[in-house]
């Protein structure tokens, strides 16, 4: 399973790359606004430049989201985003207009990511429209007492049944269990916040064992110095 990092932070992207855990990046306007702080001084050209800088760090796909809801405007913006860097994938919301944009962009050879997907119906439409990727938001479904990972399993089954080439990006990941369940189900990709990537490496028994090893190593060192 591939690991994408879900962030717009250049520092986090570089850190994930240094760990060998970076197969791609997903961003959205909210993530970019979070790192910018004062959005009033951040122009659309600044946004494009930030996407370019992300793509220069990442060796894989970088999903950049359109900022409009009209099909024609999404197509126009998507073409401009794709021109920033060869790694850019255009994220479009799963709406009727979004499907139109996905179809048009896909037919032009531009990779697309159908985002804000919350049902198997939407995922089926994304694949039919030619989306390169589909992003089911599991954490947000969990938030409303719906089993988000059940949706991932449904999508994988549908795609396997018909041989769709659309890759499943498990998104809105909140904790390591989401990542492990994604891997067990056979999802293509999990897009993970950097904080969760760090959590994947943690286990209390590892900490306890390491503490004991270090204590014993210190004793051995004292004995060898004696």
From Swiss-Prot:
GO BP terms: carbohydrate metabolic process; pentose-phosphate shunt
Annotated keywords: Cytoplasm, Pentose shunt, Schiff base, Transferase
Active site: 91 (schiff-base intermediate with substrate)
GO molecular function list: aldehyde-lyase activity; transaldolase activity
GO cellular component assignments: cytoplasm
Annotated EC: 2.2.1.2
Subcellular locations according to the entry: Cytoplasm
Pfam family name, one: TAL_FSA
Pathway, per record: Carbohydrate degradation; pentose phosphate pathway; D-glyceraldehyde 3-phosphate and beta-D-fructose 6-phosphate from D-ribose 5-phosphate and D-xylulose 5-phosphate (non-oxidative stage): step 2/3
Reaction catalysis annotation: D-sedoheptulose 7-phosphate + D-glyceraldehyde 3-phosphate = D-erythrose 4-phosphate + beta-D-fructose 6-phosphate
InterPro entries xref list: Aldolase_TIM, TAL/FSA, Transaldolase_3B, Transaldolase_3B/F6P_aldolase, Transaldolase_AS, TSA/FSA_arc/bac
Entry similarity comment: Belongs to the transaldolase family. Type 3B subfamily.
Protein task: Transaldolase is important for the balance of metabolites in the pentose-phosphate pathway.
Name of the molecule in the record: Probable transaldolase
Species assigned in the record: Chlorobium phaeobacteroides (strain DSM 266 / SMG 266 / 2430)
Gene designation: tal
